């Protein structure tokens, strides 16, 4: 059976973006860990920041390394089983890191109120596998409603929009940019 072009575009528009599901999961986890999400999918001509979040030092488990609130630029990599790049870790190349750095600089240039924040680049690795069509209960809830009901812990799977998602690794201060 072949689909005409209008059927194909309808199918594609209804397909769920698993990358966005991964970002939703990580944002929920960050909120549960006491982070405030400032921006999601912030874009400029240089690139995109998946999540920009802040946390006060008083709410950190190990606050000895930070004198000021933390501003985290979080790169989320969502991958299915059997991927070729170590669940997205190998996709954060030096080139990608430089692009994230430049994008973060542009983000900060318009926000003088964040000048004293300790900035870092974190990487969140999410596994995502299609499991089945949405249950009747899930079909009645938007993705936002489904997310609001989730409890997210590193290493534990959750079901969202017919997918099984696992935040399997969160790497704080995943890389440092060396300025030459």
UniProtKB/Swiss-Prot annotation:
Top-level taxonomic group: Bacteria
Residues in coiled coil: none
One GO MF term attached to the UniProt entry: nucleic acid binding
SUPFAM superfamilies: Restriction endonuclease-like
InterPro entries: Restrct_endonuc-II-like, tRNA_endonuc-like_dom_sf, UPF0102_YraN-like
One Pfam family it belongs to: UPF0102
Gene3D superfamilies found in the cross-reference section: 3.40.1350.10
PANTHER family: UPF0102 PROTEIN YRAN
Protein family per UniProt: Belongs to the UPF0102 family.
NCBIfam families: YraN family protein (TIGR00252)
Name recorded for this polypeptide: UPF0102 protein Tery_0733
Organism, as annotated: Trichodesmium erythraeum (strain IMS101)
Source organism phylogeny: Bacteria, Bacillati, Cyanobacteriota, Cyanophyceae, Oscillatoriophycideae
């Amino acid at each position: 059976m072949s689909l005409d072009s209008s059927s194909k575009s309808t199918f594609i528009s209804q397909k769920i973006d698993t990358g966005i599901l991964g970002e939703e999961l990580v944002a929920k986890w960050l909120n549960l860990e006491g982070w405030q999400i400032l921006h999601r999918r912030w874009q400029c001509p240089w690139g995109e920041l998946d999540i920009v979040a802040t946390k006060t030092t008083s709410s950190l488990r190990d606050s000895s390394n930070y004198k000021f609130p933390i501003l985290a630029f979080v790169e989320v990599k969502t991958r299915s089983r059997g991927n070729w790049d170590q669940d997205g870790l190998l996709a954060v190349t030096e080139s990608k890191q430089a692009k994230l750095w430049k994008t973060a600089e542009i983000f900060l240039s318009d926000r003088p109120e964040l000048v004293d924040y300790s900035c870092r680049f974190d990487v969140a690795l999410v596994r995502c596998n299609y499991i089945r069509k949405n249950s009747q209960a899930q079909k009645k809830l938007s993705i936002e409603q489904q997310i609001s009901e989730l409890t997210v812990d590193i290493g534990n799977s959750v079901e969202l929009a017919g997918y099984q998602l696992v935040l399997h690794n969160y790497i704080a201060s995943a890389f440092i940019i060396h300025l030459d």
